[in-house]
Regions:
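Divalent metal-coordination and catalytic microenvironments
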Residues: 8, 23, 29, 54, ...
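Alpha-helix-loop-beta-strand connector modules within alpha/beta enzyme cores
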Residues: 107-124, 172-183, 334, 338
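Histidine/acidic residue-rich metal-binding segments in metalloenzymes
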Residues: 140-306
Length: 427
């Protein structure tokens, strides 16, 4: 039946809504009405609306960088556990990376993936295919065929296209069929064997470093190619102040988009402390100046998107020495709460944060998600933005517990999450 919510703080950047109001969801799970005009005075008298007491309603989050273990690594995460973890964090749409076993690089594996997603997932899954066969960085995959099968974008995920000739061929193909390509911007030669950001901490811990120039040089290269070959190009994750400077300069010349991981927005290399493998990330955490520059980059609209970079790893692969430990952190459940920290400490406006988590990613992907437009699926979350809680890995829903923020106090928690008008998560 119909559902009525009133007295909510609604933030929907796509429709420029930022007001106290209500939401009406039809029997079909679509949005019928929204905003300040929805209140007790104009509801049918027999209806009992749910009073949200000024809690927030946000569009369901769109997370552009998520690793799921299917196929091949189901012991780390599968579609069912990913869905439940995502829903608890207000995420209703995810873009999945092709770094699976086998790699998502051909039509038959896409069919399998879509079947699994349809059967097991409660959220919207938008799969990526790899740019190159088996993510080896040599032969291109068949963009045209894969796009027809419903692939949303192409990326080698954790790997970079190192060869500039191959990259220009990729860009030409992308331009021809209008598909989106996403680059993990890190020159693999300059970053070779690196574990954490180059600098004082790396030296102190005796770990080989990943210099900031590895990122910058690759961005410079790709944006130079992009001037010649205009295609839909997205830099997956920025991590340094210098990269922001490059982007600021290039934005005036050429059209592209970029993202940042919540890890790089919230943490810096000092958090690694005494070899904490849970903070071995890619791109690495850098200096506090870099973190501040990334926050400023969002403020200045140089960076478009915040991602969780959710990469579940089992205990075994993190309990190794730093150099042997797997890279990545589980983050989809804490993405929104950790992002809200930037609102609570006055770094960013609430609207800027929500835009980077909802309408901006949807716009880049060209999907009609991340908004609360009338007639659209009612994918949204109800959030108490002031509710304090502490991250405890045993409480996490994801199959893998490799959070980068164990024991951190956060402010702001998702209370309910709805997909197509159905409540699929309740705190």
């Amino acid at each position: 039946k119909k559902q009525f919510f009133i007295n909510a703080n609604i933030v929907d950047p796509h429709n420029s809504i930022n007001e106290i109001g209500g939401l009406i969801i039809g029997e079909d799970g679509k949005i019928e009405a929204i905003g300040k005009k929805v209140n007790t005075n104009n509801l049918p008298t027999r209806e009992k609306p749910i009073d949200l007491k000024e809690k927030h309603i946000f569009p369901g989050l769109v997370d552009m960088r998520v690793f799921v273990g299917e196929p091949g690594y189901e012991y780390k995460e599968n579609f069912r556990t990913l869905s439940d973890a995502a829903l608890s964090g207000g995420v209703t749409s995810v873009v999945t990376m092709p770094n699976t076993d086998p790699v998502i690089d051909n039509v038959s594996i896409v069919d399998f993936l879509k079947r699994r997603g349809r059967d097991k997932s409660k959220i919207n899954i938008f799969p990526c295919a790899s740019l190159t066969k088996n993510i080896e960085g040599t032969n291109m995959t068949e963009f045209g065929l894969l796009q027809k099968k419903g692939i949303i974008a192409f990326t080698d995920g954790t790997k970079t296209i190192q060869n500039p000739r191959l990259m220009s061929r990729i860009m030409n193909s992308a331009k021809d069929i209008g598909c989106l390509i996403m680059q993990h911007a890190e020159d693999s030669e300059l970053a070779k064997n690196g574990m954490i950001n180059s600098g004082i901490i790396a030296s102190k811990l005796g770990l080989s470093g990943i210099p900031e120039i590895a990122e910058r040089i690759l961005i410079e290269r790709d944006l130079t190619l992009l001037e010649k070959i205009k295609c839909r190009y997205h830099i997956s994750q920025l991590s340094s102040q210098k990269s922001i400077e490059v982007i600021k300069h290039r934005k005036e010349i050429v059209k592209f988009t970029s993202g940042v991981s919540i890890n790089n927005l919230s943490l810096n290399e000092n958090d690694i402390g005494d070899f904490r493998t849970f903070l071995k990330l890619s791109p690495p955490l850098r200096r506090e100046e870099d973190r501040i520059a990334l926050v400023q980059g969002l403020k200045d609209e140089l960076i478009d998107v915040i991602v969780s970079d959710h990469k579940p790893e089992d205990e075994e692969s993190k309990r190794l020495t730093f150099s042997q430990a797997a890279t990545g952190a589980s983050g989809i459940e804490t993405l929104l709460s950790l992002s809200l920290e930037l609102y609570h400490n006055d770094s960013l406006k609430l609207e800027t944060i929500i835009k980077a988590l909802t309408s901006n990613p949807a716009k880049i992907l060209k999907i009609d998600k991340g908004n609360l437009s009338i007639g659209n699926d009612a994918d949204f979350c109800i959030v108490d933005i002031n509710k304090p809680w502490i991250v405890k890995k045993e409480k996490l829903i994801s199959k893998s517990k490799n959070t980068s923020i164990e024991d951190k106090k956060l402010q702001g928690k998702v209370i309910n999450t709805f997909v197509k008008g159905k409540e699929l998560f309740k705190l």
